[in-house]
């Protein structure tokens, strides 16, 4: 069971006043519209399904209908149709096929659905309606009219709210060097992301401890097809498992009801976890230390810088910038380039088969696998051997920009 602090019923009345404009949260079994998409969502969906399977003894969850985003074409020439990981989990749990919703209109249409006994949602108005929404890493704002149409609307968020509101709480916690993080169960605000009332929250959890545990040995890990960077994948697993426990506890103990006690919100400093952009993955050699770049790589995935190259066309400008992706790196703590080396300068170490790049503080980043724009990922030695052909005379200028 996840540790939670308790508060007085008076405080609870304040935190639970969000739920519906004229209705109390349901105590009858829940027919849940589950909004999710990624690996973090899988854990909560499993916990919810366990409550559904144990319905005879506890009567908490009756039906689950997964709602997710449409699959996307990706890969070279958009040749691969990639489904959100929640699709595979729903199939594994033998739940109805997920409904895909990408627009406000598509989501509002869900208010007409009712779960059928066969497990396929119907819109004929028969049967008990969906009476709960649970959103876990869905990625879109659920319309207020849909939220207000159900008595209960909850969200599982991987941070200690109000710290790291927004779409990238796990990545921002890692990038900003947070010592602790956690999971929050909050209500769904009808108009804004992460502005609901806190229903339950874990104690602060040491990030270093969670990272040391590695991936969760759970069937949800089988469905991590997202190719996440190491640190993000570990923290997503660890927080996903804890969030699932907290969600199960919240529903079993009905912590959302005014007469029940919930965890007291702690006064964490508010912050916003902005969506990860291409600029976040840009290397600034004079600003970033080698350790910071390694943390970025293991949090965001391949980073990029640029290499100046001679223009191939005679009528073009004298030089062009080619994007370089850095895929595999480590920090060299006991090595330095020449005394006159400046951030971004590099040389090849043939013994280690790596490219040594000077970073802020004059420490070196050892790059073993990287990728020149328009070419495949390659070892450092291959990159250096082909640099002349790709950059022309400017290959002699051993500087990443």
From Swiss-Prot:
The secretion signal range is: none
What broad class of enzyme is this?
A: transferase
Query: Keywords for this entry?
Result: Cytoplasm, Mitochondrion, Protein biosynthesis, Transferase, Transit peptide
| Any single Pfam family the record assigns to this protein | Formyl_trans_C
UniProt record, GO biological process: conversion of methionyl-tRNA to N-formyl-methionyl-tRNA
Q: Which NCBIfam families match?
A: fmt
Q: What else is known?
A: Formylation of the initiator Met-tRNA is not essential for mitochondrial protein synthesis in S.cerevisiae.
List the PANTHER family hit by this protein, alphabetically: METHIONYL-TRNA FORMYLTRANSFERASE (PTHR11138), METHIONYL-TRNA FORMYLTRANSFERASE, MITOCHONDRIAL (PTHR11138:SF5)
Kindly provide the name given to this protein in its UniProt entry.
Answer: Methionyl-tRNA formyltransferase, mitochondrial
Q: What's the encoding gene here?
A: FMT1
């Amino acid at each position: 069971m996840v540790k939670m602090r308790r508060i007085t019923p008076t405080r609870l009345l304040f935190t639970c006043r969000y739920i519906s404009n004229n209705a109390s949260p349901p105590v009858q079994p829940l027919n849940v519209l589950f909004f999710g998409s990624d690996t973090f969502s899988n854990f909560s969906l499993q916990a919810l399904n366990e409550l559904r399977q144990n319905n005879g003894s506890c009567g908490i969850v009756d039906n689950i209908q997964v709602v997710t985003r449409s699959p996307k074409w990706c890969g070279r020439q958009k040749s691969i149709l990639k489904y959100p990981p929640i699709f595979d989990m729903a199939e594994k749990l033998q739940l109805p096929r997920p409904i895909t919703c990408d627009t406000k209109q598509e989501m509002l249409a869900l208010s007409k659905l009712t779960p059928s006994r066969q497990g396929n949602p119907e819109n004929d108005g028969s049967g008990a309606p969906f009476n709960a929404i649970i959103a876990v890493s869905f990625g879109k704002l659920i319309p207020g009219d849909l939220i207000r149409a159900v008595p209960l609307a909850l969200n599982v968020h991987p941070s200690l709210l109000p710290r790291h509101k927004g779409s990238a709480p796990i990545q921002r916690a890692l990038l900003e060097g947070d010592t602790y993080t956690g999971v929050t169960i909050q209500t769904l605000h009808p108009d804004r992301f992460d502005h609901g009332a806190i229903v339950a929250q874990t104690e602060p959890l040491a990030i270093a401890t969670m990272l040391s545990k590695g991936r969760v040995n759970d069937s949800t890990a089988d469905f991590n097809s997202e190719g996440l960077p190491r640190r993000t994948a570990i923290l997503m697993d660890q927080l996903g498992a804890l969030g699932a426990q907290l969600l199960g506890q919240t529903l079993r103990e009905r912590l959302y009801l005014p007469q029940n006690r919930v965890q007291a919100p702690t006064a964490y400093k508010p912050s916003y976890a902005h969506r990860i952009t291409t600029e976040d993955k840009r290397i600034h050699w004079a600003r970033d230390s080698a350790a910071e770049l390694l943390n970025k790589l293991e949090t965001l995935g391949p980073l990029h810088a640029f290499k100046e190259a001679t223009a191939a066309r005679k009528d073009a400008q004298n030089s062009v910038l080619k994007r370089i992706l850095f895929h595999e790196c480590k920090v060299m703590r006991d090595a330095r380039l020449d005394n006159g080396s400046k951030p971004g300068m590099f040389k090849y170490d043939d013994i280690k088969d790596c490219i040594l790049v000077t970073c802020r503080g004059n420490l070196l980043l050892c790059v073993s696998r990287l990728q020149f724009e328009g070419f495949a990922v390659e070892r450092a030695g291959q990159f250096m051997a082909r640099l002349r052909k790709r950059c022309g005379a400017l290959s002699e200028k051993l500087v990443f920009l």
